[in-house]
């Protein structure tokens, strides 16, 4: 058997295999013999048809069987011989039909892990966002809580203003695009929340009860149907009801409705603490992304498309699950699955590269996970609940895969900590995050 390996890229190989004619002949005869035992041809009992007739009528079946058998018998031994480990199923690139007396030739494309030789990974320069307390953000959160507790009171006289909630019947059309026509009855619309198409909100303001009005809007540039971007659309709206939001008074009684607060001052204090915790966690996550990006920049590598594809699938499933929990879908975001994969391919590739480089760093620096590390992680998950801690330990003791995943996570965390301990971290305001670091 002859085997030729061609390097297509650092992570892709073409393997060409030629199986000698003698072996092909043997497999063909073996295949026909097996087919003959099961063959049913007119005028003959099962398994009693002459071999020559079997060869005539079952040639395609023989070719399928022998090609598959020779492929399976030769490809993986050839890969083992050349120490090639595919990261995904090999893909047939070229294959010839099997013929008596002729060598069987085929080629397959495989993807392999990149060879990683870490270069510069100490002294990486990264920026870290400086945490800044923001009283306005806390007050904004309190206002949103008031909005959620607002009562709607009917408005009998007057016209539509910002902040009002309307009940309308409507129809919508884009001239020249009949498939876009739609309509609805008793639709609830809030004016002033920034969610309406450009022009619609302005057209609703000033309408009176019972009024019917044509409102021209401009279709947004990011419309899922690209043909409609920038085109005019017309809403015909009949205003059936106007309601005005009545916000609750901002006092201790309001704060107590949320259960966690005793007074309005207590609410502000605890919301400030919660926001600080959330912001510090966000900054930590952003810093992790930045240090990995810096590592990739200093250690560029190519990664297999199949690994990136799996990462995009993983990200897509996570997004779909999150949206499902919010009663939303990809379509409601103007995306489909293929569009998502295309849009986030670069992000997925970056995640794969970062993961491989971090794994290489773990090996190079002999980063290990001790039992104390696992105990600390168990305690973190249990959050002070002793009964929960006991159950967590029992679970991870019994579930090897879950325990291995936790070990991998801890190794990654320790590798990131190592990178940051050995990095030049510059703390800056949020507005300066994407400006070049001095010396770059």
UniProtKB/Swiss-Prot annotation:
GO terms for molecular function: peptidyl-prolyl cis-trans isomerase activity; protein folding chaperone; ribosome binding. It is found in: Cytoplasm. Residues 163-248 form the PPIase FKBP-type domain. Pfam families: FKBP_C, Trigger_C, Trigger_N. Its EC number is 5.2.1.8. GO terms for cellular component: cytoplasm. It comes from the Bacteria. One of its GO terms (biological process) is chaperone-mediated protein folding. It catalyses: [protein]-peptidylproline (omega=180) = [protein]-peptidylproline (omega=0). InterPro entries: PPIase_dom_sf, PPIase_FKBP_dom, Trig_fac, Trigger_fac_C, Trigger_fac_C_sf, Trigger_fac_ribosome-bd_bac, Trigger_fac_ribosome-bd_sf, Trigger_fact/SurA_dom_sf. Keywords: Cell cycle, Cell division, Chaperone, Cytoplasm, Isomerase, Rotamase. It is an enzyme of class 5 (isomerase). Transmembrane segments: none annotated. Its main location: cytoplasm. Consists of 3 domains; the N-terminus binds the ribosome, the middle domain has PPIase activity, while the C-terminus has intrinsic chaperone activity on its own. Involved in protein export. Acts as a chaperone by maintaining the newly synthesized protein in an open conformation. Functions as a peptidyl-prolyl cis-trans isomerase. Belongs to the FKBP-type PPIase family. Tig subfamily. PANTHER family: TRIGGER FACTOR CHAPERONE AND PEPTIDYL-PROLYL CIS/TRANS ISOMERASE (PTHR30560), TRIGGER FACTOR-LIKE PROTEIN TIG, CHLOROPLASTIC (PTHR30560:SF3). This is Trigger factor. It comes from Trichlorobacter lovleyi (strain ATCC BAA-1151 / DSM 17278 / SZ). The gene is tig.
